[in-house]
């Protein structure tokens, strides 16, 4: 029984350490926002980062308001939303 406790504790410690090592990685908060075309009707071709597919996709931006997950071109979207490594 003590052996199982020690092994369980060791596994838990490894998970905690691994989680701590990944702190600071990931994408910027703006890349986690849903696409928002805003209330205007300009229909400007833009790109947003799709969290589910982890790719940049085209959408039509209305030209006003919206949110920060809105990029003029696919290259900027990919560069800004690439997962950051520490």
Curated annotation (Swiss-Prot):
Glycans are attached at residue 73. It is found in: Secreted. Residues 1-19 form the signal peptide. Induction: Induced in salivary gland during blood feeding. Disulfide bonds join 31-81, 40-64, 56-77. Its main location: secreted. Salivary gland. It comes from the Eukaryota. The keyword Signal applies. GO terms for cellular component: extracellular space. Keywords: Blood coagulation cascade inhibiting toxin, Disulfide bond, Glycoprotein, Hemostasis impairing toxin, Protease inhibitor, Secreted, Serine protease inhibitor, Signal, Toxin. GO terms for biological process: envenomation resulting in negative regulation of voltage-gated potassium channel activity in another organism. The keyword Mitochondrion does not apply. This is Kunitz-type anticoagulant protein Ir-CPI. Anticoagulant protein. Increases fibrinolysis time. Inhibits thrombin generation. Inhibits the generation of the active forms of host coagulation factor XII, factor XI and plasma kallikrein. Residues 31-81 form the BPTI/Kunitz inhibitor domain. It comes from Ixodes ricinus. GO terms for molecular function: serine-type endopeptidase inhibitor activity; toxin activity.
């Amino acid at each position: 029984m003590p052996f199982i406790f020690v092994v369980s504790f060791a596994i838990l410690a490894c998970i905690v350490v691994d989680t701590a090592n990944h702190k600071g990685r990931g994408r910027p908060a703006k890349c986690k926002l849903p696409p928002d075309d805003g209330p205007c009707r300009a229909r400007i071709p833009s790109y947003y980062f799709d969290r589910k597919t982890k790719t940049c996709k085209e959408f039509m931006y209305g030209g006003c308001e919206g949110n920060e997950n809105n990029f003029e071109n696919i290259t900027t979207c990919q560069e800004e939303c690439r997962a950051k490594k520490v």
